[in-house]
């Protein structure tokens, strides 16, 4: 059994791909009724909460591999790692981005704490340190549709955006056959590095009308994250990453 720890854009796709290839797969979610398509695809949808160790332990029964993907809150992911140790899981595929103990970005310090906890656990592991997701632009879809413009705090920073579906496919493949990937770290990225102005040019070409980019302040970026429904903690993390991208710190 392979356990996927959330059903977000990567977790849901990884679960679907594993079920499609006939692998036994379970996904841990707070509200199973919100993911009927996964159950219909043959995924074992298990109710649980990454804050509650007992529910993680229940989901970890008979699991050999874990795809660890979540908003990267250290206490939650360390709960999963501890549960995997108790269940004698063989391998963990950790989805993450950049990690550093002394980063000015809280999310990256948190990622470092999780990474070190996984390495110290004695579990087999693979780290996928992916670049920024292309799908993050969907948060700006309404603004682009209504104003033919979008703003971020990235400035002139250039990023190799990667498709979250590709990350899901890589994670699923490793979780299903982990032997060749034990202890490895991979850095998935997109095929080219693009500034926000470059991205606006792509939107213009595809949509057949002019789309422009305008820089915004850190405060405006933070509010934009909250406006599209991100929690305060996740919104701050995304905002800090955008600002770091703009300063060439990616």
Tell where the protein language model's regions lie, with residue ranges.
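NAD(P)-dependent Rossmann-like dehydrogenase/reductase catalytic/cofactor-binding core
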Residues: 243-250
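Conserved SAM-binding strand-loop segment of SAM-dependent methyltransferases
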Residues: 44-47
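Oxidoreductase cofactor-interface core, primarily capturing Rossmann-like NAD(P)-dependent enzymes
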Residues: 1-40, 51-54, 58-65, 70-91, ...
């Amino acid at each position: 059994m392979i356990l996927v720890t959330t059903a977000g854009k990567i977790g849901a796709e990884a679960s679907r791909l594993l079920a499609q290839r006939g692998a036994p797969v379970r996904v841990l979610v707070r509200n199973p009724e919100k993911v009927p398509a996964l159950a219909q695809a043959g995924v074992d949808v298990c109710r649980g909460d990454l804050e509650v160790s007992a529910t993680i332990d229940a989901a970890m029964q008979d699991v050999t591999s874990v795809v660890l993907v979540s908003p990267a809150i250290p206490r939650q992911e360390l709960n999963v790692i501890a549960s995997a140790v108790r269940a004698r899981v063989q391998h963990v595929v950790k989805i993450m981005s950049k990690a550093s103990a002394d980063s000015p970005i809280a999310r990256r310090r948190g990622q470092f704490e999780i990474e070190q906890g996984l390495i110290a656990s004695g579990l087999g592991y693979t780290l996928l340190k992916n670049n920024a997701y292309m799908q993050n632009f969907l948060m700006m879809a309404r603004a682009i549709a209504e104003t033919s413009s979008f703003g971020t705090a990235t400035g002139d920073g250039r990023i190799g955006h990667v498709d979250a579906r590709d990350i899901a496919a890589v994670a699923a493949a490793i979780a299903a056959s982990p032997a060749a990937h034990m202890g490895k770290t991979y850095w998935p990225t997109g095929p080219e590095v693009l500034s926000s102005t470059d991205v606006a040019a792509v939107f213009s070409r595809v949509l057949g009308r002019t789309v422009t980019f305008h820089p915004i302040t850190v405060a405006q970026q933070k509010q934009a994250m909250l406006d599209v429904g991100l929690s305060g903690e996740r919104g701050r993390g995304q905002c800090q990453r955008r600002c770091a991208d703009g300063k060439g710190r990616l």
